[in-house]
């Protein structure tokens, strides 16, 4: 029998999700994504003409700015920006608007654990609401490994203090299937990959693959929620 966590969830249970479309009027698209008490606002501006020095002018550029709840941005937040930029570049169709820059601004509203996955999910929704061309949707989930080897999903902040290691995983989810009840075989195959994988702490190969297996199984629940949300709130964009 699986033991309950301090908040009453079982190891595979995710916190409640919510997503609000375009809470920020001045952005081209925005989303407020919440997982329990972890809340992130993502705002998309662009595409705007021109790219920064060092960027490929034959493709669109993605710029990410992370704003913490309080204080100045630090090393961890800079790492979040880099991870988000790489992740978003991998899901956006960068050849559609060459020599342009799309800015994604993230504001942390609440942090009760699994902050980076929450931010990635917020970004994905905001990009859709802004009408940015995507190869596919993406869903992110946090997986924690306890000292006894137990894997728990969507960790809160208190749990993160007790982890031996953790993995933040981003899985692709066919963009086309967001408006399709039954994705075809090619789309189903594309959902089995891994876009981004960030690990921290001492993690064995067995623990890592256990995180991937459990995370992939749980990601379908986030995918279903995201599809339903996008169909309901912006049927023309998905």
Curated annotation (Swiss-Prot):
InterPro entries per record: ExoRNase_PH_dom1 (IPR001247), ExoRNase_PH_dom2_sf (IPR036345), PNPase/RNase_PH_dom_sf (IPR027408), Ribosomal_Su5_D2-typ_SF (IPR020568), RNase_PH (IPR050080)
Pfam families given in the database record: RNase_PH
Comp. bias regions, Basic and acidic residues: 183-192
GO molecular-function term, one example from the UniProt record: DNA nuclease activity
Compartments where found: Nucleus, Nucleolus
A GO BP annotation: rRNA processing
Gene Ontology cellular component annotations, sorted alphabetically: cytoplasmic exosome (RNase complex); nuclear exosome (RNase complex); nucleolus
Taxonomic superkingdom: Eukaryota
Region (Disordered) residue spans: 174-194
The enzyme's E.C. designation: 3.1.13.-
Signal peptide (residue range): none
Enzyme kind, highest EC tier: hydrolase
Gene3D superfamilies according to UniProt: GHMP Kinase, N-terminal domain
Family label: Belongs to the RNase PH family.
Subunit field text: Homodimer or monomer when reduced or oxidized, respectively. Component of the exosome core complex.
The protein, known as: Exosome complex exonuclease RRP46 homolog
Organism: Oryza sativa subsp. japonica
